[in-house]
């Protein structure tokens, strides 16, 4: 099984591994040394809970060809369940 590790304040989310595609995985700050930064993404107006936000970030990272991503900011807007997130992408 593939594990998506969240930031310390979030829960661990587990996804089944795909036989056909390799998805981008979460990388903590202490694990990115030596990885090649390939860009950043920002996503806003995400409805749902923190796990939904992480799934969206993983999908966006996949679209950009990233193997890893690190969420650098994630916060809930003034409206409940409306999130903004920024992440760094790595190859």
Swiss-Prot record:
Top-rank taxon: Bacteria
InterPro entries (alphabetical): BhsA/McbA_stress_biofilm_assoc (IPR051096), Dodecin-like (IPR025543), YdgH-like_sf (IPR036275), YdgH/BhsA/McbA-like_dom (IPR010854)
Leader peptide range in chain numbering: 1-21
GO molecular function, a single term: endopeptidase activator activity
Gene Ontology BP annotations: response to stress
Keyword Iron-sulfur tagged: no
Short name of any one Pfam family annotated for the protein: YdgH_BhsA-like
Locations listed in the record: Periplasm
Entry annotated with the keyword Signal: yes
Keywords of the record: Periplasm, Signal
GO cellular component: periplasmic space
Family: Belongs to the BhsA/McbA family.
Protein name: Uncharacterized protein YjfN
Lineage, broadest ranks: Bacteria, Pseudomonadati, Pseudomonadota, Gammaproteobacteria, Enterobacterales
